[in-house]
A protein has these predicted regions:
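Juxtamembrane/start-of-transmembrane alpha-helix segments at the extracytoplasmic/lumenal side
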Residues: 292-310
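C-terminal membrane-anchoring or membrane-association module
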Residues: 314-328
Length: 328
């Protein structure tokens, strides 16, 4: 592992063909990052497929997202993973010292991301994608509590069913900006995250979101309303937890991105090390095109109307250099 930062390039390209959106990315985020214990992040060769028009699951039997592996893709082309890590525990609960890990030590780095082998991915948060540092700040100063709480958060990712994933702040029923919270909490009979998703229970009305970690409502991009998922650092549960240091802490916002697909998950990964992919992958035709560029400070968001049914947020990069923090 090097003690010296070095530069990486974030590259994302998109193409619309055959009723789908195809996104190609190298998996390098648009912010400084640490690989942590997994070591060491490499450029990948991802092809992600998304439906142009999201189709709601008609019978309500929502397909579960994979507990391990990609459930969505961030707007910078980095995969967003389910809650569990390699040993089968909740990676985010371990990061917050909810339990002792005696199988394989896992660390999460800046913005809730790390590498498993060569593949960099997020397990939670990812709000730093749209964070703008203050004077004298850099990514090492980032914390999700520094996200602007006075405005509705932007789109930070897209699920494989075509619905967007927003950052942690949204509108309530009277259009006030509030922190959106999940409706899950630890089971009293569970192992505090050691057994992964099995240690959590959904309680309707506990927070703001449904069992998939989403809700229907207006957003800046969809003023008439759309179903959307939310990145949830915190749960709506009033229960607290005593961590392994003996400190009493808030209930974290499992499942962090999404637990199940509200729509038909006909998208998914085509390449790279993002396994396991969800079922129903559709293979598109056409060539990659439509390259645009990122700003120096943070990803420029490009929103366009496609088929009058869904807005696709596109984060594209050409030649943007980013420093990588020393890997540990």
């Amino acid at each position: 592992n090097s003690n010296d930062p070095f530069t990486c390039t974030t590259v994302v390209t998109i193409d619309e063909a055959g009723g789908e959106i195809q996104v190609a990315a190298n998996g390098i985020p648009n912010h400084d990052f640490t690989s942590t214990k997994g070591c060491c992040t490499n450029e990948e060769d991802y092809d992600w497929i998304f439906p142009i028009t999201a189709v709601e699951d008609s019978d309500g039997s929502y397909e579960s997202g994979p507990a391990r592996g990609a459930v969505a893709v961030a707007v910078n082309g980095v995969p967003m993973f389910g809650p569990e890590d390699g040993p089968g525990g909740d990676a985010v609960a371990l990061h917050h010292k909810y339990y002792h890990e005696d199988r394989q030590q896992i660390d999460l780095g800046i913005c809730g991301g790390h590498s498993a082998g060569s593949t960099y991915h997020y397990h939670w948060d990812a709000n730093c994608i749209l964070w703008q540092p203050g004077d004298g700040e850099d990514i090492s100063d980032y914390d999700w509590t520094k996200i602007n709480s006075s405005i509705h958060s932007g789109i930070i990712g897209w699920s494989f069913d075509g619905y967007p994933i927003y950052g942690l702040y949204g509108w309530n029923e009277v259009a006030d900006v509030v922190q959106v919270k999940s409706s899950y909490q630890l089971k009293a009979s569970g192992q505090d995250g050691y057994d992964g998703t099995d240690d959590w229970e959904y309680i309707e009305g506990l927070g703001d979101l449904d069992e998939c970690n989403g809700m229907f409502g207006p957003t800046p991009e969809y003023p008439d309303g759309i179903y959307h998922y939310v990145s949830t650092p915190i749960s709506g549960s009033s229960n607290t937890h005593v961590d392994t240091d003996g400190s009493t802490v808030e209930m974290i916002g499992f499942p962090y991105f999404l637990m199940c697909y509200h729509g038909e998950a006909t998208g998914g990964p085509k390449g790279g090390n993002s396994q396991p992919p969800p079922p129903g992958i559709v293979h598109p035709s056409g060539i990659l095109a439509g390259i645009d560029s990122l700003s120096e400070s943070w990803i420029s968001q490009h929103i366009r109307q496609i088929s009058g049914a869904i807005l696709i947020l596109i984060a594209l990069a050409v030649g943007l250099l980013r420093k990588r923090q020393p890997e540990t």
